[in-house]
Amino acid sequence: IYTPSKVVTQKEMEKHDGCEGKYTNGLYQDEIGFCDENEDAVSMALTAVSRMMQKSRVNWSDVGRIEVGTESLVDRSKSIKSFLMRLFSEHGVHNACGVDNYHACYGGTAALLNSVDWVRSTGTDQMALVVCVDIADLNEEQAFLNGASCVAMLVGKNAPMEILGPRGHHFMDTTDF
């Protein structure tokens, strides 16, 4: 997990907005992290993946798929996944498949479910890497929903957590906020 070091407590936000308890008790939020001028979705993803691979001691070549879930594009023609391949290339891995799932709050869920399905459907023992990264920067009325963070997860067979079916989906063309 990577969260930026710049934070604002939700107690401060409640005081500013005159709504004591709304964010801390109502939304169970303690603080909001914000990116510094030298941070973006790519740098957070690179940091989270580097740390996770180091701590897990998984061989880079054991990852056969990289799926990113985000709503924070940094380049409209280049995926965050392609930036992450820089780390894998440094370890001789150039063939990890996968894509970015660009879809508001569902992007990370889609990346996870796609990876679970890939692990189940393939005859390989390789794992999938799921990276969920976002930077929310909403208008002043919705500032309590702002924030930034990244999580990297490994998905593989015989994992300590199992994702079971059935699944339900409901999609509509709507404005979230």
Where are these regions (language model features)?
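Phosphate/pyrophosphate-binding loops at sites that engage ATP/ADP/AMP, CoA/4′-phosphopantetheine
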Residues: 21, 48-64
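Acidic, glycine-rich active-site loops and adjacent beta-strand->loop/helix elements
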Residues: 2, 69-75, 102-108, 132-137, ...
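Flexible, glycine-rich active-site loops centered on histidine and acidic residues
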Residues: 120, 124-153
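Buried hydrophobic positions in well-ordered alpha/beta secondary-structure cores of metabolic enzymes
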Residues: 52, 63-66, 111, 154
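Beta-strand segments within the central parallel beta-sheet cores of soluble alpha/beta enzyme folds
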Residues: 61-69, 96-100, 125-133, 164-167
